[in-house]
Swiss-Prot record:
The protein's name in its UniProt record: Luc7-like protein 3
Amino-acid biosynthesis among keywords: no
Cell compartments where the protein resides: Nucleus speckle
Cross-link (Glycyl lysine isopeptide (Lys-Gly) (interchain with G-Cter in SUMO1)): 424
Basic residues compositional bias, start-end: 288-301, 312-367
Task performed by this protein: Binds cAMP regulatory element DNA sequence. May play a role in RNA splicing.
Keyword Chaperone attached: no
Organism: Bos taurus
Subunit structure: May interact with SFRS1 and form homodimers. Interacts with JMJD6. Interacts with RBM25. Interacts with RSRC1 (via Arg/Ser-rich domain). Interacts with RRP1B.
Recorded GO MF terms: DNA binding; mRNA binding
Phosphoserine found at: 3, 110, 115, 420, 425, 431
Residue ranges of coiled coil: 124-181
Family named by the database record: Belongs to the Luc7 family.
Modified residues (N6-acetyllysine): 231
Length: 432
Protein backbone atom coordinates (compact mmCIF):
# COMPACT_ATOMS: atom_id res chain seq x y z
CA UNK A 1 0.00 0.00 0.00
CA UNK A 2 2.85 2.38 0.77
CA UNK A 3 4.45 1.89 -2.64
CA UNK A 4 1.07 2.42 -4.32
CA UNK A 5 0.58 5.66 -2.36
CA UNK A 6 4.02 6.85 -3.38
CA UNK A 7 3.26 6.00 -6.98
CA UNK A 8 0.04 8.03 -6.77
CA UNK A 9 1.94 10.90 -5.12
CA UNK A 10 4.43 10.93 -7.96
CA UNK A 11 1.72 10.77 -10.60
CA UNK A 12 -0.93 13.10 -9.10
CA UNK A 13 0.90 14.96 -6.35
CA UNK A 14 0.64 14.78 -2.58
CA UNK A 15 -2.42 17.02 -2.62
CA UNK A 16 -4.43 14.71 -4.84
CA UNK A 17 -7.06 14.06 -2.16
CA UNK A 18 -7.65 17.72 -1.25
CA UNK A 19 -10.88 19.46 -2.11
CA UNK A 20 -10.79 22.47 -4.46
CA UNK A 21 -11.45 24.86 -1.55
CA UNK A 22 -8.77 23.37 0.69
CA UNK A 23 -5.36 24.97 0.97
CA UNK A 24 -2.52 23.15 -0.70
CA UNK A 25 0.68 22.53 1.25
CA UNK A 26 3.71 24.33 -0.17
CA UNK A 27 6.74 22.17 0.58
CA UNK A 28 10.21 23.50 -0.11
CA UNK A 29 13.03 21.34 -1.39
CA UNK A 30 14.91 21.69 1.91
CA UNK A 31 12.01 20.30 3.96
CA UNK A 32 12.82 17.20 5.98
CA UNK A 33 10.01 15.24 4.32
CA UNK A 34 11.69 15.57 0.91
CA UNK A 35 14.02 12.77 -0.24
CA UNK A 36 17.45 14.35 -0.57
CA UNK A 37 18.74 11.40 -2.61
CA UNK A 38 16.03 12.03 -5.18
CA UNK A 39 17.06 15.72 -5.35
CA UNK A 40 20.61 14.61 -6.16
CA UNK A 41 19.52 12.36 -9.02
CA UNK A 42 17.57 9.27 -7.99
CA UNK A 43 16.50 7.31 -4.95
CA UNK A 44 18.32 3.95 -4.64
CA UNK A 45 15.17 2.39 -3.15
CA UNK A 46 13.52 2.64 -6.57
CA UNK A 47 16.27 0.62 -8.27
CA UNK A 48 15.89 -2.78 -6.59
CA UNK A 49 12.17 -3.27 -6.11
CA UNK A 50 11.16 -6.95 -6.17
CA UNK A 51 14.80 -8.13 -6.32
CA UNK A 52 17.15 -9.85 -3.88
CA UNK A 53 18.73 -6.43 -3.17
CA UNK A 54 15.40 -4.71 -2.45
CA UNK A 55 15.96 -1.79 -0.03
CA UNK A 56 12.32 -1.33 0.81
CA UNK A 57 10.05 1.60 -0.03
CA UNK A 58 11.17 5.21 0.55
CA UNK A 59 8.62 7.12 2.66
CA UNK A 60 9.87 10.60 1.65
CA UNK A 61 8.65 12.87 -1.13
CA UNK A 62 9.89 12.31 -4.66
CA UNK A 63 8.94 15.40 -6.66
CA UNK A 64 10.48 16.41 -9.97
CA UNK A 65 9.51 20.08 -9.49
CA UNK A 66 11.31 20.21 -6.15
CA UNK A 67 14.40 18.77 -7.79
CA UNK A 68 14.29 21.47 -10.48
CA UNK A 69 13.88 24.13 -7.79
CA UNK A 70 16.89 22.74 -5.97
CA UNK A 71 19.00 22.72 -9.15
CA UNK A 72 18.05 26.37 -9.87
CA UNK A 73 18.65 27.58 -6.32
CA UNK A 74 21.81 29.38 -5.23
CA UNK A 75 22.52 26.63 -2.67
CA UNK A 76 22.87 23.92 -5.29
CA UNK A 77 25.72 21.52 -4.35
CA UNK A 78 26.49 23.68 -1.31
CA UNK A 79 24.26 22.06 1.33
CA UNK A 80 26.06 18.71 1.44
CA UNK A 81 23.31 16.53 -0.04
CA UNK A 82 25.63 15.27 -2.76
CA UNK A 83 28.26 14.12 -0.26
CA UNK A 84 25.65 12.23 1.77
CA UNK A 85 24.31 10.68 -1.43
CA UNK A 86 27.84 9.67 -2.46
CA UNK A 87 28.52 8.05 0.93
CA UNK A 88 25.24 6.09 0.73
CA UNK A 89 25.99 4.87 -2.80
CA UNK A 90 29.51 3.88 -1.75
CA UNK A 91 28.07 1.86 1.13
CA UNK A 92 25.81 0.01 -1.35
CA UNK A 93 28.81 -0.64 -3.61
CA UNK A 94 30.84 -1.88 -0.64
CA UNK A 95 28.03 -4.32 0.17
CA UNK A 96 27.86 -5.67 -3.37
CA UNK A 97 31.66 -5.93 -3.44
CA UNK A 98 31.49 -8.11 -0.33
CA UNK A 99 28.83 -10.20 -2.06
CA UNK A 100 31.07 -10.59 -5.11
CA UNK A 101 34.00 -11.66 -2.93
CA UNK A 102 31.80 -14.21 -1.15
CA UNK A 103 30.63 -15.56 -4.52
CA UNK A 104 34.21 -15.98 -5.69
CA UNK A 105 35.07 -17.74 -2.45
CA UNK A 106 32.11 -20.13 -2.83
CA UNK A 107 33.09 -20.95 -6.40
CA UNK A 108 36.67 -21.60 -5.37
CA UNK A 109 35.52 -23.83 -2.50
CA UNK A 110 33.14 -25.86 -4.67
CA UNK A 111 35.78 -26.30 -7.32
CA UNK A 112 38.27 -27.50 -4.71
CA UNK A 113 35.73 -29.91 -3.32
CA UNK A 114 34.93 -31.25 -6.75
CA UNK A 115 38.58 -31.65 -7.61
CA UNK A 116 39.37 -33.28 -4.28
CA UNK A 117 36.26 -35.55 -4.52
CA UNK A 118 37.17 -36.71 -7.99
CA UNK A 119 40.86 -37.05 -7.31
CA UNK A 120 40.30 -39.13 -4.13
CA UNK A 121 38.55 -42.15 -5.72
CA UNK A 122 40.68 -41.94 -8.78
CA UNK A 123 43.85 -42.05 -6.71
CA UNK A 124 42.59 -45.02 -4.68
CA UNK A 125 41.63 -46.93 -7.82
CA UNK A 126 45.06 -46.28 -9.27
CA UNK A 127 46.65 -47.67 -6.14
CA UNK A 128 44.41 -50.78 -6.27
CA UNK A 129 45.17 -51.26 -9.93
CA UNK A 130 48.89 -51.04 -9.20
CA UNK A 131 48.58 -53.61 -6.36
CA UNK A 132 46.60 -55.94 -8.57
CA UNK A 133 49.16 -55.58 -11.34
CA UNK A 134 51.96 -56.47 -8.92
CA UNK A 135 50.04 -59.50 -7.69
CA UNK A 136 49.37 -60.63 -11.22
CA UNK A 137 53.06 -60.37 -12.06
CA UNK A 138 54.02 -62.41 -8.98
CA UNK A 139 51.42 -65.06 -9.75
CA UNK A 140 52.60 -65.33 -13.34
CA UNK A 141 56.15 -65.91 -12.15
CA UNK A 142 54.95 -68.58 -9.78
CA UNK A 143 52.90 -70.19 -12.57
CA UNK A 144 56.02 -70.32 -14.74
CA UNK A 145 58.00 -71.87 -11.93
CA UNK A 146 55.23 -74.45 -11.29
CA UNK A 147 55.03 -75.24 -15.01
CA UNK A 148 58.79 -75.77 -15.14
CA UNK A 149 58.49 -78.06 -12.14
CA UNK A 150 55.60 -79.96 -13.76
CA UNK A 151 52.94 -78.90 -11.30
CA UNK A 152 50.23 -78.31 -13.85
CA UNK A 153 47.17 -78.40 -11.55
CA UNK A 154 48.58 -75.84 -9.16
CA UNK A 155 49.57 -73.74 -12.09
CA UNK A 156 46.03 -73.89 -13.52
CA UNK A 157 44.51 -72.92 -10.14
CA UNK A 158 46.83 -69.93 -9.89
CA UNK A 159 45.98 -69.10 -13.51
CA UNK A 160 42.29 -68.80 -12.57
CA UNK A 161 43.28 -66.44 -9.73
CA UNK A 162 45.23 -64.30 -12.18
CA UNK A 163 42.15 -64.09 -14.43
CA UNK A 164 40.05 -62.87 -11.51
CA UNK A 165 42.61 -60.23 -10.60
CA UNK A 166 42.70 -59.03 -14.19
CA UNK A 167 38.91 -58.70 -14.27
CA UNK A 168 38.99 -56.71 -11.04
CA UNK A 169 41.70 -54.43 -12.46
CA UNK A 170 39.66 -53.76 -15.59
CA UNK A 171 36.66 -52.90 -13.44
CA UNK A 172 38.66 -50.36 -11.46
CA UNK A 173 39.97 -48.79 -14.66
CA UNK A 174 36.44 -48.44 -16.07
CA UNK A 175 35.23 -46.78 -12.81
CA UNK A 176 38.00 -44.15 -12.94
CA UNK A 177 37.16 -43.17 -16.52
CA UNK A 178 33.45 -42.83 -15.59
CA UNK A 179 34.21 -40.44 -12.69
CA UNK A 180 36.40 -38.27 -14.92
CA UNK A 181 33.67 -38.07 -17.56
CA UNK A 182 31.11 -37.04 -14.92
CA UNK A 183 33.41 -34.30 -13.61
CA UNK A 184 33.97 -33.01 -17.13
CA UNK A 185 30.24 -32.90 -17.80
CA UNK A 186 29.46 -30.75 -14.66
CA UNK A 187 28.51 -27.01 -15.39
CA UNK A 188 31.05 -24.23 -14.70
CA UNK A 189 29.80 -21.15 -12.79
CA UNK A 190 31.08 -17.53 -12.54
CA UNK A 191 30.25 -14.41 -10.52
CA UNK A 192 28.95 -11.18 -12.14
CA UNK A 193 31.42 -8.40 -11.31
CA UNK A 194 28.64 -5.77 -11.25
CA UNK A 195 25.83 -7.21 -9.16
CA UNK A 196 27.42 -10.38 -7.66
CA UNK A 197 24.95 -12.87 -9.24
CA UNK A 198 26.08 -16.37 -10.33
CA UNK A 199 26.21 -16.99 -14.06
CA UNK A 200 26.74 -20.14 -16.08
CA UNK A 201 29.83 -20.11 -18.23
CA UNK A 202 28.88 -20.46 -21.86
CA UNK A 203 25.19 -19.99 -21.19
CA UNK A 204 22.79 -18.92 -23.93
CA UNK A 205 23.03 -15.32 -25.06
CA UNK A 206 19.34 -14.70 -24.37
CA UNK A 207 19.79 -15.57 -20.71
CA UNK A 208 22.91 -13.40 -20.54
CA UNK A 209 20.96 -10.48 -22.05
CA UNK A 210 18.12 -11.01 -19.60
CA UNK A 211 20.59 -10.78 -16.75
CA UNK A 212 22.23 -7.63 -18.13
CA UNK A 213 18.83 -5.94 -18.56
CA UNK A 214 17.64 -6.94 -15.10
CA UNK A 215 16.87 -4.43 -12.34
CA UNK A 216 19.63 -5.58 -10.04
CA UNK A 217 22.40 -5.50 -12.63
CA UNK A 218 21.28 -2.17 -14.12
CA UNK A 219 20.77 -0.66 -10.66
CA UNK A 220 24.31 -1.43 -9.50
CA UNK A 221 25.72 -0.31 -12.86
CA UNK A 222 23.89 3.00 -12.45
CA UNK A 223 25.20 3.33 -8.89
CA UNK A 224 28.79 2.79 -10.06
CA UNK A 225 28.44 5.37 -12.86
CA UNK A 226 26.82 7.86 -10.47
CA UNK A 227 29.61 7.41 -7.92
CA UNK A 228 32.25 8.20 -10.53
CA UNK A 229 30.26 11.20 -11.76
CA UNK A 230 29.73 12.57 -8.24
CA UNK A 231 33.41 12.14 -7.42
CA UNK A 232 34.35 14.14 -10.51
CA UNK A 233 31.83 16.88 -9.73
CA UNK A 234 32.91 17.19 -6.11
CA UNK A 235 36.56 17.19 -7.14
CA UNK A 236 35.88 20.05 -9.53
CA UNK A 237 33.90 21.88 -6.86
CA UNK A 238 36.77 21.51 -4.43
CA UNK A 239 39.24 22.55 -7.10
CA UNK A 240 37.22 25.65 -8.04
CA UNK A 241 37.95 27.47 -4.75
CA UNK A 242 41.58 26.45 -5.08
CA UNK A 243 41.60 27.66 -8.67
CA UNK A 244 39.83 30.87 -7.65
CA UNK A 245 42.32 31.33 -4.84
CA UNK A 246 45.19 30.63 -7.21
CA UNK A 247 43.80 33.07 -9.78
CA UNK A 248 43.27 35.65 -7.06
CA UNK A 249 46.81 35.13 -5.83
CA UNK A 250 48.18 35.43 -9.36
CA UNK A 251 46.15 38.60 -9.86
CA UNK A 252 47.52 40.04 -6.62
CA UNK A 253 51.05 39.13 -7.69
CA UNK A 254 50.49 40.82 -11.07
CA UNK A 255 49.12 43.91 -9.33
CA UNK A 256 52.10 43.96 -6.96
CA UNK A 257 54.48 43.65 -9.92
CA UNK A 258 52.64 46.48 -11.70
CA UNK A 259 52.84 48.62 -8.57
CA UNK A 260 56.54 47.83 -8.22
CA UNK A 261 57.16 48.76 -11.86
CA UNK A 262 55.10 51.94 -11.37
CA UNK A 263 57.14 52.83 -8.29
CA UNK A 264 60.33 52.23 -10.23
CA UNK A 265 59.09 54.43 -13.09
CA UNK A 266 58.11 57.17 -10.62
CA UNK A 267 61.49 56.89 -8.91
CA UNK A 268 63.27 57.17 -12.27
CA UNK A 269 61.07 60.14 -13.18
CA UNK A 270 61.80 61.87 -9.87
CA UNK A 271 65.50 61.20 -10.31
CA UNK A 272 65.38 62.57 -13.86
CA UNK A 273 63.52 65.65 -12.65
CA UNK A 274 66.03 66.21 -9.86
CA UNK A 275 68.90 65.90 -12.32
CA UNK A 276 67.12 68.29 -14.70
CA UNK A 277 66.57 70.76 -11.87
CA UNK A 278 70.22 70.48 -10.85
CA UNK A 279 71.30 71.09 -14.45
CA UNK A 280 68.89 74.03 -14.69
CA UNK A 281 70.21 75.49 -11.44
CA UNK A 282 73.77 75.02 -12.67
CA UNK A 283 72.90 76.75 -15.95
CA UNK A 284 71.21 79.56 -14.00
CA UNK A 285 74.30 79.95 -11.82
CA UNK A 286 76.47 80.02 -14.93
CA UNK A 287 74.24 82.66 -16.49
CA UNK A 288 74.33 84.68 -13.26
CA UNK A 289 78.11 84.46 -13.11
CA UNK A 290 78.40 85.50 -16.76
CA UNK A 291 75.94 88.33 -16.15
CA UNK A 292 77.88 89.49 -13.11
CA UNK A 293 81.15 89.34 -15.01
CA UNK A 294 79.62 91.33 -17.87
CA UNK A 295 78.11 93.85 -15.46
CA UNK A 296 81.47 94.23 -13.71
CA UNK A 297 83.21 94.70 -17.03
CA UNK A 298 80.57 97.21 -18.13
CA UNK A 299 80.79 99.01 -14.80
CA UNK A 300 84.55 99.17 -14.98
CA UNK A 301 84.42 100.38 -18.57
CA UNK A 302 81.76 102.93 -17.69
CA UNK A 303 83.75 104.08 -14.67
CA UNK A 304 86.83 104.49 -16.77
CA UNK A 305 84.75 106.26 -19.42
CA UNK A 306 83.29 108.58 -16.80
CA UNK A 307 86.72 109.31 -15.46
CA UNK A 308 88.04 109.99 -18.91
CA UNK A 309 85.04 112.16 -19.75
CA UNK A 310 85.40 114.05 -16.49
CA UNK A 311 89.07 114.66 -17.11
CA UNK A 312 88.31 115.73 -20.67
CA UNK A 313 85.52 118.01 -19.48
CA UNK A 314 87.78 119.47 -16.85
CA UNK A 315 90.50 120.00 -19.40
CA UNK A 316 88.04 121.54 -21.81
CA UNK A 317 86.67 123.87 -19.13
CA UNK A 318 90.17 124.89 -18.13
CA UNK A 319 91.16 125.41 -21.72
CA UNK A 320 88.00 127.46 -22.33
CA UNK A 321 88.69 129.53 -19.21
CA UNK A 322 92.24 130.06 -20.27
CA UNK A 323 91.13 131.04 -23.72
CA UNK A 324 88.57 133.43 -22.30
CA UNK A 325 91.07 134.95 -19.89
CA UNK A 326 93.60 135.25 -22.64
CA UNK A 327 91.08 136.80 -24.96
CA UNK A 328 90.05 139.22 -22.25
CA UNK A 329 93.66 139.95 -21.52
CA UNK A 330 94.30 140.54 -25.17
CA UNK A 331 91.30 142.79 -25.44
CA UNK A 332 92.30 144.67 -22.33
CA UNK A 333 95.88 144.93 -23.46
CA UNK A 334 94.83 146.07 -26.87
CA UNK A 335 92.39 148.59 -25.48
CA UNK A 336 94.99 149.69 -23.02
CA UNK A 337 97.53 150.09 -25.77
CA UNK A 338 95.10 151.99 -27.86
CA UNK A 339 94.10 154.14 -24.94
CA UNK A 340 97.72 154.74 -24.08
CA UNK A 341 98.51 155.56 -27.62
CA UNK A 342 95.43 157.69 -27.99
CA UNK A 343 95.11 159.09 -24.48
CA UNK A 344 98.43 159.17 -22.80
CA UNK A 345 97.28 161.96 -20.72
CA UNK A 346 94.52 160.07 -19.12
CA UNK A 347 96.66 157.77 -16.98
CA UNK A 348 94.51 158.26 -13.98
CA UNK A 349 91.49 157.08 -15.86
CA UNK A 350 93.44 154.07 -17.02
CA UNK A 351 94.38 153.18 -13.51
CA UNK A 352 90.80 153.47 -12.45
CA UNK A 353 89.75 151.36 -15.34
CA UNK A 354 92.37 148.83 -14.46
CA UNK A 355 91.17 148.70 -10.89
CA UNK A 356 87.62 148.25 -12.13
CA UNK A 357 88.85 145.58 -14.45
CA UNK A 358 90.54 143.78 -11.62
CA UNK A 359 87.37 143.90 -9.53
CA UNK A 360 85.32 142.68 -12.40
CA UNK A 361 87.86 139.94 -13.01
CA UNK A 362 87.56 138.78 -9.42
CA UNK A 363 83.80 138.87 -9.69
CA UNK A 364 83.94 136.95 -12.95
CA UNK A 365 86.34 134.40 -11.47
CA UNK A 366 83.89 133.75 -8.63
CA UNK A 367 81.06 133.40 -11.10
CA UNK A 368 83.24 131.11 -13.16
CA UNK A 369 83.85 128.94 -10.08
CA UNK A 370 80.13 128.73 -9.44
CA UNK A 371 79.54 127.95 -13.09
CA UNK A 372 82.22 125.28 -12.94
CA UNK A 373 80.58 123.64 -9.89
CA UNK A 374 77.24 123.68 -11.61
CA UNK A 375 78.73 122.13 -14.72
CA UNK A 376 80.49 119.44 -12.69
CA UNK A 377 77.14 118.49 -11.09
CA UNK A 378 75.55 118.36 -14.49
CA UNK A 379 78.39 116.20 -15.71
CA UNK A 380 77.89 113.80 -12.81
CA UNK A 381 74.21 113.63 -13.66
CA UNK A 382 75.02 113.00 -17.28
CA UNK A 383 77.48 110.29 -16.16
CA UNK A 384 74.69 108.50 -14.24
CA UNK A 385 72.52 108.72 -17.35
CA UNK A 386 75.40 107.47 -19.46
CA UNK A 387 75.68 104.49 -17.13
CA UNK A 388 72.27 103.32 -18.33
CA UNK A 389 73.12 103.69 -21.98
CA UNK A 390 74.44 100.84 -24.13
CA UNK A 391 78.04 99.97 -24.76
CA UNK A 392 77.82 100.92 -28.41
CA UNK A 393 76.52 104.45 -27.69
CA UNK A 394 79.29 104.96 -25.13
CA UNK A 395 81.85 103.81 -27.67
CA UNK A 396 80.41 106.12 -30.30
CA UNK A 397 80.39 108.94 -27.76
CA UNK A 398 83.95 108.21 -26.92
CA UNK A 399 84.96 108.39 -30.55
CA UNK A 400 83.08 111.65 -31.04
CA UNK A 401 84.56 113.12 -27.88
CA UNK A 402 88.01 112.06 -28.98
CA UNK A 403 87.54 113.84 -32.27
CA UNK A 404 86.18 116.91 -30.46
CA UNK A 405 89.07 116.82 -28.05
CA UNK A 406 91.54 116.67 -30.88
CA UNK A 407 89.80 119.58 -32.60
CA UNK A 408 89.65 121.56 -29.37
CA UNK A 409 93.26 120.80 -28.63
CA UNK A 410 94.12 122.00 -32.09
CA UNK A 411 92.04 125.16 -31.42
CA UNK A 412 93.75 125.54 -28.08
CA UNK A 413 97.10 125.26 -29.73
CA UNK A 414 96.07 127.87 -32.28
CA UNK A 415 94.80 130.18 -29.53
CA UNK A 416 98.00 129.65 -27.58
CA UNK A 417 99.97 130.50 -30.66
CA UNK A 418 97.81 133.59 -31.21
CA UNK A 419 98.13 134.61 -27.59
CA UNK A 420 101.86 134.29 -27.75
CA UNK A 421 101.87 136.45 -30.85
CA UNK A 422 99.67 139.05 -29.10
CA UNK A 423 101.95 139.01 -26.09
CA UNK A 424 104.90 139.51 -28.32
CA UNK A 425 103.19 142.39 -30.09
CA UNK A 426 102.15 143.89 -26.73
CA UNK A 427 105.71 143.61 -25.51
CA UNK A 428 106.89 145.34 -28.61
CA UNK A 429 104.34 148.07 -28.07
CA UNK A 430 105.34 148.60 -24.45
CA UNK A 431 108.96 148.68 -25.41
CA UNK A 432 108.13 151.34 -27.93
Amino acid sequence: MISAAQLLDELMGRDRNLAPDEKRSNVRWDHESVCKYYLCGFCPAELFTNTRSDLGPCEKIHDENLRKQYEKSSRFMKVGYERDFLRYLQSLLAEVERRIRRGHARLALSQNQQSSGAAGPTGKNEEKIQVLTDKIDVLLQQIEELGSEGKVEEAQGMMKLVEQLKEERELLRSTTSTIESFAAQEKQMEVCEVCGAFLIVGDAQSRVDDHLMGKQHMGYAKIKATVEELKEKLRKRTEEPDRDERLKKEKQEREEREKEREREREERERKRRREEEEREKERARDRERRKRSRSRSRHSSRTSDRRCSRSRDHKRSRSRERRRSRSRDRRRSRSHDRSERKHRSRSRDRRRSKSRDRKSYKHRSKSRDREQDRKSKEKEKRGSDDKKSSVKSSSREKQSEDTNTESKESDTKNEVNGTSEDIKSEGDTQSN
